[in-house]
Amino acid sequence: MNAPLILLTAGGTGGHLFPAEALANALKAAGCRVALATDKRANAYAGSFPADEIVEIPSATPSGRSVPQIVKAALMLAQGTLKASAVIRQMKPVVVVGFGGYPTVPPVIAASLLGVPTVIHEANGVMGRANRLLARRATVIATGFANIKGVPANVPGRMVQTGNPIRPAVLEAARQPYAGLSTDEPFRLLVVGGSQGARVMSDVVPPAIELLPEGIRSRLSITQQARGEDLERVRAHYSKFGVTFEAEPFFKDLPHRLAQAHLVISRSGASTVAELAVIGRPSILVPLPGALDQDQAANAKTLEDLGAAIVCPQTEFTPERLAREIQSLFQQPDRLTRAASAAHSASIADAAERLAQVVLQLVPSQHNGKSP
């Protein structure tokens, strides 16, 4: 008997693909085959994705307000649903799992129309628009947080909290305990802006470092993710005042660097928050502004409420404010240690296995021999 095939579908950014990758590893360990349906943005990440097959499904985000934009997006989603239907008929997955973003809409709708069980996973503290659209069709809704907002009526009875699946590389990095800041080692600062970078980090962090007293600045060792177009000015700024730094558009070993950090300055996407919790590192979080759902603000609040993070809205994220926060934490290293411990208390390290069990419970009985 062939191993059951599970079709995962995710938008082509790290925030959607990383938890899908973690689930794929857990499902393969349980004896399943895995395929991935995504969009063209996934090329930067798909090379390491443990899928037996990867297919590109047309999609669009209906974000415009004009009638032509809405019609164009609707037509793209309809086209994607037709292609997804053909893919599902050909591949014959036994369950389809969506990880949010509009690229998941065509495969999940197609699966529900064809009678294939579906799971959607909501990683954020507020249910996203695509998942809200799919929630009433989904067989099960898995969540990263216990009490998420924006859930449609008549859905909560099908919800289960699994946590946000974590990649093996992050779990490996989590084995390194937080060392705390001592007087004879560098103060390691990690600055990241999510999988797609964030210009505000390049605008604010280097000038903030320049404002710090020389005694603190000389102790810093900075690793900063910067967009390609911002890279030279970030490097030039740090070089100007002699701080130890490394700046690149992308770090393949980011989990290792996260584990090495004494303090992380970051956006607060769901994957980032989950990784900060599992590895257990203190952070200054700057939620992405302008999002309709304010999902990053909700994610950040979960760590702030535990004392694991300082949350700074982007309107208040100035060089002066950031310099004050860094100086205060440097001068009170026990705060960093307490925040690291608080972050770790929020972790669900086995979230991938929990979600895999939810998926495997939907596998038809003729395949049950492949389930644990």
Task: Outline where the language-model segments fall.
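Donor-nucleotide binding loops and adjacent catalytic segments primarily
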Residues: 24-29, 36-37, 42-53, 57, ...
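An amphipathic, basic-hydrophobic alpha-helix
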Residues: 66-95
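C-terminal alpha-helical cap of glycosyltransferases
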Residues: 348-372
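Glycosyltransferase specificity loop/lid
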Residues: 4-75
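Active-site-proximal region of nucleotide-activated glycan assembly enzymes
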Residues: 33, 41, 52, 112-175
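Acidic donor-binding loop of glycosyltransferase active sites
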Residues: 93-95, 259-273, 281
